[in-house]
A protein has these predicted regions:
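Extended alpha-helical scaffolding segments used for macromolecular assembly and cargo binding
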Residues: 1-71, 79-80, 87-90, 96
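Alpha-helical linker/edge segments of TPR/alpha-solenoid repeat scaffolds
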Residues: 51-60, 383-394
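Conserved alpha-helical positions within TPR/SEL1-like repeat arrays
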Residues: 59-70, 86, 95-110, 119, ...
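TPR-repeat structural position
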Residues: 5-8, 21, 41, 74, ...
């Protein structure tokens, strides 16, 4: 913590103790702008909660919602955003209302509720256009593109990303331009055009390095690593993941560090080095638990289960998958729950327990329908296949 931030923290403590809400709110906002980008989520939540003891404050609700969302607690986050929205609307702060709608949309997106996410983004967009927030408009267009990308509509995703790219270039938002180029690269990666993906990632890297956006550079390096991973160039993938990891550690982003370690573990799985993969996953798990990210914890436990399954240790695989399920349900991640139940079904199928595999797949298909998952058709086909296999007998 820098000396300046330490002084602000002490001023905030004294303002709360002295019942001086205006000072507490102003200082809390300043400190949150420093802490949120470096994953100091628990500290942001504590400070915002202290400020709120002095009365309702939209900014504190917003900051606390962000912190709670980032640490895997989507429902408390959504309640904070709801409170912030009420106050911003009462104050006529249309720009902040739009920002809050956009953040709430991101939470719903993380929960797998793509339609509700899209609804929030589409409500934010006209507000941003009304107040002339071109940079915010670009971010929201990017978010809308992200929904369409996940829904399996890459061309609609690209259309929104290109609109966002035009705006970021028009307003001179170099960091935003880099983010959008990265997102465009990811669409190309998803449709298998990996060389075009790498071209966009390299453009983004050039910009992030030019503007000194270390966090953005790390994100793009991670994406470059993922592209090389899909190309089968695992050594180059690991090299880029390690470059990202070095930056992430330098900026103190603990959640990002866990994500990078998780990515490295995934590459080791592809290389068949399963014990090294497990070492990376366990390092990531310790960090993600430290920062309190329940959704991230579930994702890493899921990968640990997958690694044990690859090792042929079905009992340990099932143990870890079953650790994942209550967390997925706790955070409301129905899409993630479907993924884990699918993994459980495959373990049971490999072990010859078709009855249990079918029961899990029935739940998978039901969850797929609830969230509009693009894997519904494939999962339904597998369920039919297993039912037919059971009917035919050994």
């Amino acid at each position: 913590m820098t000396a300046t931030v330490a002084r602000w923290v002490e001023v905030h403590r004294l303002a709360v103790a002295g019942r001086q809400p205006e000072i507490a709110r102003d200082v809390g906002d300043r400190v949150s702008r420093v802490w949120l980008p470096t994953s100091r989520f628990a500290a942001v939540e504590a400070m915002a909660t202290a400020t709120l003891t002095l009365g309702p404050d939209a900014g504190s609700f917003y900051d606390r919602g962000w912190a709670r969302s980032a640490t895997g607690r989507p429902w408390p986050a959504l309640e904070d955003y709801r409170q912030a929205l009420i106050l911003y609307r009462q104050a006529g702060q249309r720009g902040n209302e739009a920002a809050t709608l956009s953040q709430a949309g991101r939470v719903y997106f993380g929960l797998g509720d793509r339609q509700r996410a899209l609804d929030h983004y589409q409500r934010a967009l006209p507000l941003q256009r009304e107040v002339g927030d071109r940079a915010g408009e670009a971010v929201t267009l990017t978010n809308i593109g992200g929904v369409h990308s996940v829904l399996g509509d890459p061309y609609r995703a690209l259309d929104h990303y290109q609109q966002a790219l035009t705006i970021t270039r028009a307003v001179g938002d170099r960091a935003g331009e880099a983010t959008t180029l990265t997102d465009i690269g990811t669409v190309y990666s998803n449709v298998g055009d990996l060389q075009r993906a790498l071209d966009h990632y390299q453009q983004a890297l050039t910009i992030t390095r030019a503007v000194g956006n270390r966090a953005g550079e790390a994100t793009t390096l991670n994406n470059v690593g993922a592209a090389y991973h899909r190309l089968g160039d695992q050594r180059r993938a690991i090299d880029h993941y390690h470059q990202a990891l070095t930056i992430i550690r330098a900026v103190g982003n603990r959640a990002g560090e866990a994500a990078a370690l998780n990515n490295i573990g995934d590459v080791y799985i592809g290389l068949g080095e399963l014990q090294r993969a497990l070492d990376q996953f366990h390092q990531a798990l310790a960090i993600i638990r430290e920062v309190g990210d329940r959704a991230g914890e579930a994702a890493i436990l899921n990968n640990i289960g997958a690694a044990y399954n690859r090792l042929g240790d079905r009992q340990r695989a099932l143990h870890h998958f079953h650790l994942v399920l209550p967390i997925r349900r706790e955070v409301g991640d129905r899409a993630g729950e479907a993924t884990t139940r699918y993994n459980i079904a495959l373990v049971h199928r490999a072990g010859g327990d078709l009855d249990q595999a079918i029961r899990e797949l029935e739940r998978v298909v039901d969850l797929d329908r609830q969230v509009g998952h693009p894997g519904l058709e494939a999962d339904t086909a597998l369920l039919r296949q297993l039912r037919q296999q059971r009917a035919e007998g050994p």
